[in-house]
Structure formats: structure tokens, C-alpha cells
């Protein structure tokens, strides 16, 4: 399906809609980045038609039929972005609301597909600064989502510089390594491993 889910906007339409809402101060906006764990195994065990159905069900449940949703967008096969209105809601209210939706949806998936454990990952960014570019705001929601990967005990994560620092540092190191490879600045040294019992070199460890 490639993210072309019935009822969802394209990338530019989504960004423009969110920008318009934020600039006019029409609603308080919270951005969502969402995907699910182990989606590949639904395709493998139950077939691609079932996988497509799960993706459309996510689109319907979290965005298209959600009364708080102002705009939504599908990316790739299993990535979603959305904007909810959070008028008269605290941050804690929004987190609780999303957590309840996750429990409902995960329970339904576990009943339909008992062979595959499913967890919904959600990152949130409260878009309270209209001067911030919408693409950067969406990236912050996505960064919050990525920071919870593998943490099945976290129903959703709100972006903050503190809780995303570790991921940012990892991303910076990865980018620096890629640049170093491209510029041929990588040197590899072999550190020998000595076998005391056999009194010989048993191997080596590569140091970059």
C-alpha cells in the first residue's frame, strides 16, 4: 500500500494543514509519530492482505475516525504522522488518552494475531511554538518515538531534550562515522589476543 491509506493526506497537504492550524492559533496541537512492532511477522504468518488490513485499521482507529485528529499522513508501509487537537487538555491528559487507545488496539491485535506480539510505538510533540518549522516539529515527535524502541512498557513518549539526548548523541556518532568513511579517515588496528595455555596468538580484535 506504500502509505496510501484511504482517508489520509499526502506529505505536503499534511504539513500545510498543520502549519495553517498552528499559525492561526485555531487549536493547541500535539503531533504524533506512530508505528507498530513486528509488523513484518504479520505479513509472514498471516499474509500481506492481513498486513494491509492492520495498516488501514491503524489509519482508521488513530486518525481517520478519531475525533481529536486534525490531519494525518502515512509514510512507507507502517509509519504514520498525525496532528491532534489538545484544547483544554494537559500533557498528562493527552498521554493518558493515547495510552488507553494503545491498550484497546493492542488487545484487538493480540486476539486477531496470537502468533505475533504487537506494541504500538507513539512519540508526541506538543506544538506550542509556532515559529518552529512544521518539519522540525514532526521530526521531534518521531525522535520521541524512536527513543522508546524496544521499551514495551512505555505506551508513548513526549519529546524533550533530556529524554532524547542519548538518541541524538548516537545519531551524531553514526553520522560522524559515515562522514569519516566517506573521507577515508578510518584506520583499523589489530590488537592480538594471546592464548596463555597454548603460548601463541589466538586471534585479534579490530580497533577503529
Predicted features, each with a name:
Residues 83-94, 110-115, 119-137, 162-166, ...:
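Catalytic strand-loop-helix junctions within cyclic-nucleotide turnover domains
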Residues 2-30, 37-63, 73-77, 81-82, ...:
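Conserved long alpha-helical elements within nucleotide-processing catalytic cores of c-di-GMP signaling
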Residues 136-161, 165, 175-187:
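Catalytic/regulatory signature loops of cyclic-dinucleotide turnover enzymes
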Residues 68-71, 188-190:
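A short linear hydrophobic-aromatic micro-motif
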Residues 72-76, 104-121, 149:
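Catalytic core regions of nucleotide second-messenger enzymes
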Residues 166-208:
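Active-site core of bacterial EAL-family cyclic-dinucleotide phosphodiesterase domains
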Residues 2-8, 12, 49-52, 164-171, ...:
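A conserved signal-transducing helical linker
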Residues 31, 80, 120-124, 190, ...:
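A structural signal for short, well-ordered beta-strand segments
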Amino acid at each position: 500500500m506504500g502509505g496510501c491509506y484511504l482517508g489520509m493526506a499526502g506529505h505536503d497537504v499534511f504539513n500545510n494543514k498543520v502549519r495553517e492550524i498552528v499559525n492561526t492559533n485555531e487549536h493547541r496541537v500535539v503531533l504524533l509519530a506512530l508505528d507498530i512492532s513486528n509488523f513484518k511477522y504479520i505479513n509472514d504468518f498471516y499474509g500481506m492482505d492481513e498486513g494491509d488490513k492492520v495498516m488501514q485499521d491503524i489509519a482508521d482507529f488513530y486518525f481517520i475516525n478519531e475525533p481529536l485528529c486534525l490531519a494525518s499522513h502515512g509514510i512507507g508501509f507502517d509509519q504514520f504522522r498525525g496532528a491532534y487537537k489538545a484544547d483544554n487538555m494537559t500533557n498528562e491528559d493527552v498521554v493518558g488518552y493515547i495510552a488507553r487507545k494503545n491498550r484497546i488496539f493492542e488487545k484487538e491485535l493480540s486476539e486477531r494475531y496470537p502468533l505475533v506480539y504487537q506494541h504500538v510505538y507513539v512519540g508526541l510533540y506538543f506544538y506550542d511554538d509556532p515559529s518552529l518549522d512544521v518539519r522540525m516539529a514532526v521530526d521531534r515527535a518521531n525522535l520521541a518515538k524512536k527513543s522508546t524502541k524496544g521499551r514495551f512498557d512505555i505506551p508513548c513518549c513526549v519529546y524533550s531534550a533530556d529524554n532524547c539526548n542519548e538518541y541524538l548523541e548516537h545519531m551524531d556518532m553514526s553520522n560522524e562515522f559515515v562522514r569519516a568513511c566517506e573521507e577515508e579517515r578510518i584506520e583499523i588496528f589489530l590488537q592480538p589476543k594471546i592464548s596463555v595455555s597454548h603460548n601463541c596468538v589466538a586471534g585479534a580484535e579490530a580497533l577503529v
